[in-house]
UniProtKB/Swiss-Prot annotation:
It comes from Symbiobacterium thermophilum (strain DSM 24528 / JCM 14929 / IAM 14863 / T). GO terms for molecular function: manganese ion binding; metalloaminopeptidase activity. Mn(2+) 1 binds at residues 260, 337, 339. It comes from the Bacteria. Mn(2+) 2 binds at residues 255, 260, 278, 339. Pfam families: Peptidase_M17 (PF00883), Peptidase_M17_N (PF02789). One of its GO terms (cellular component) is cytoplasm. CDD domains: Peptidase_M17 (cd00433). InterPro entries: Leucine_aapep/pepB, Macro_dom-like, Peptidase_M17_C, Peptidase_M17_leu_NH2_pept, Peptidase_M17_N. This is Probable cytosol aminopeptidase. Its EC number is 3.4.11.1, 3.4.11.10. The active site is at residues 267, 341. It catalyses: Release of an N-terminal amino acid, Xaa-|-Yaa-, in which Xaa is preferably Leu, but may be other amino acids including Pro although not Arg or Lys, and Yaa may be Pro. Amino acid amides and methyl esters are also readily hydrolyzed, but rates on arylamides are exceedingly low; Release of an N-terminal amino acid, preferentially leucine, but not glutamic or aspartic acids. One of its GO terms (biological process) is proteolysis.
Length: 491
């Protein structure tokens, strides 16, 4: 989709729909209102209140180059955030598309305390997020109206922001498409192919290890999970050398579980169909690496994705087994449905052994996260307070909300084992998200590491005025912003 920034006046831009973002109590721009013979003033404050997400479509009747004007509510000016502006832009773009628009233009909001670059960035992100259609595999393809061009009305700072927003949105949408793809269409091998294709297109070095390669690396935990599958695992390593490859390296690690049946500890039928999205962390890593490369972030970033599915079979690993992986730590299997932390542990150990200075990992790790936080925020669990705060702030700046969970030493008692170094579950239902995150910390040594548990926010149930049902791409923006800030710290 084409995204352009133009310095044209509101009364000069020739598009199908001109979108005017307005806060509560703010009048429409005087020049547009005058051109429409006072129509905007009649509507604003009457039918249109400016409430968050409210839209009112006006026909210009040839009095403006734009065929229609869409009034878009932002809510109270003091409550507008990067996230709410992004959401409003998505709502506006979808409303314009529903009206048949093929080209749209956004004015920048005037009553909001946000600089031009940031406003253009989050409007662009929101528009491209809202307009994105997830792929389908239907035998009959029905034609659907599509917006082909998005214009932002602003100057050079807006141009910079819109370009940033476009690149990030494309990374998020790539992550959404990957996590939405059915497991039979996206096995570990096919996920590796998609990652390698992205790397080739963006100048990123990539290595893909097959089952034999995983054995040679000593990825015993990944291989244990893979035992019940007919699909071989893959271990994907991507290296973006934005700082010339001299280091220091930031490590991004994503869980690539392409389908999770639960293994022998099999999941209930209800909801199992959706376990194709259990590689949402890996999808976020791939989308982020694309964006990091296209933004030309001046940092060296290593991304690691351990990938397999988790299936029951006569050869599957079993509850009670003791296995070990790259870190050398031994794990007593309490549940084969707690497999994500196993494959991530090998990925994290690899990143740490490769010398990454700091690591962020993301996964749909625990159902307990939904109980703790609901579908609003992801959880952060870490082994280093300072690094956790940096990642938390990066997420906030990128418009992704997290919440820091405790990591007191006593919580490690939850994963103690009498026969191994640790268990892969908990002895009861207490603090499941904390226990899962701290399990991961056991495999990175002293390397500062933050885990994002995105289980409750990686999937949206039901479409609304902003986005379609399906994968959300959460984590992608946090990864990108954290990498950008990591680069700034090197200067």
């Amino acid at each position: 989709m084409k995204v352009e920034v133009t310095s044209q006046a509101l009364t000069e831009v020739a598009v199908d729909v001109l979108i005017l973002p307005l806060t509560e109590g703010t009048p429409a721009p005087a020049d547009v209102n005058e051109a429409l013979g006072g129509l905007c003033a009649q509507v604003v404050g009457a039918d249109f209140k400016g409430e968050m997400g409210q839209t009112t479509l006006l026909y210009t009747g040839g009095r403006l180059p734009a065929r229609k004007v869409l009034l878009l509510g932002l809510g109270k000016a003091e409550k507008v955030t990067n996230r709410s502006l992004r959401r409003a832009a998505g709502i506006g773009a979808r409303a314009a598309r529903k009206s048949g628009a093929r080209s749209i233009a956004f004015a920048l909001p005037g009553a909001v305390e946000m600089d031009e670059a940031a406003a253009a960035r989050f409007i662009t992100e929101g528009a491209l997020h809202g307009l994105f259609r997830l792929p389908d595999w239907k035998s009959e393809k029905k034609p659907r109206p599509e917006v082909e061009a998005v214009h932002i009305l602003g100057g050079e700072r807006a141009r910079e922001g819109a370009e940033h927003g476009r690149i990030v949105a494309e990374g998020v949408n790539l992550a959404r498409a990957l996590a939405w793809t059915p497991g039979n269409h996206l096995t570990a091998a096919k996920l590796a192919e998609r990652a390698a294709e992205m790397c080739r297109e963006n100048g990123i070095e990539v290595e893909v290890y097959d089952k034999k390669g995983c054995e040679e690396l000593g990825l015993g935990l990944l291989l244990a999970v893979n035992q019940g599958s007919r699909e071989e695992p893959r271990f994907i390593v991507m290296r973006y050398k934005g700082n010339g490859g001299q280091g220091p390296w930031l490590g991004l690690v994503g869980k690539g579980l392409t389908f999770d049946s639960g293994g022998i500890s099999i999941k209930p039928t209800e909801g199992m169909w959706n376990m194709k999205m259990d590689m949402g962390g890996a999808a976020a890593v791939i989308g982020a690496m694309q964006a990091i490369a296209r933004l030309k972030v001046k940092a060296d970033v290593m991304a690691v994705i351990p990938s397999t599915d988790n299936m029951p079979d006569g050869g599957s690993y079993k509850p009670g087994d003791v296995v070990s992986g790259l870190s050398g730590k031994t794990v007593e299997i309490r549940s084969t449905d707690a497999e994500g932390r196993l494959i991530l542990a090998d990925g994290l150990a690899y990143a740490a052994k490769q010398g990454c200075r700091k690591i962020i990992t993301a996964s749909t790790l625990t159902g307990a996260c939904n109980i703790a936080l609901g579908p609003i925020r992801y959880a952060l669990v870490a082994n280093d307070d300072a690094w956790e705060e940096e990642v938390y702030r990066a997420g906030e700046a990128a418009g992704e909300r997290g919440w820091k969970l405790p990591h007191d030493e006593e919580y490690y008692d939850l994963i103690k084992s009498s026969v191994a170094d640790m268990i892969n579950g908990t002895k009861n239902r207490a603090a499941g998200t904390v226990a899962g995150g701290l399990f991961l910390m056991k495999h990175v040594g002293d390397t500062p590491c933050v885990h994002l548990d995105i289980a409750a926010v990686a999937w949206k149930s039901g479409s609304d005025e902003y986005e379609d049902e399906g994968a959300t791409g959460v984590g992608t923006r946090t990864f990108v912003e954290a990498a950008r800030r990591f680069a700034e710290g090197l200067r």
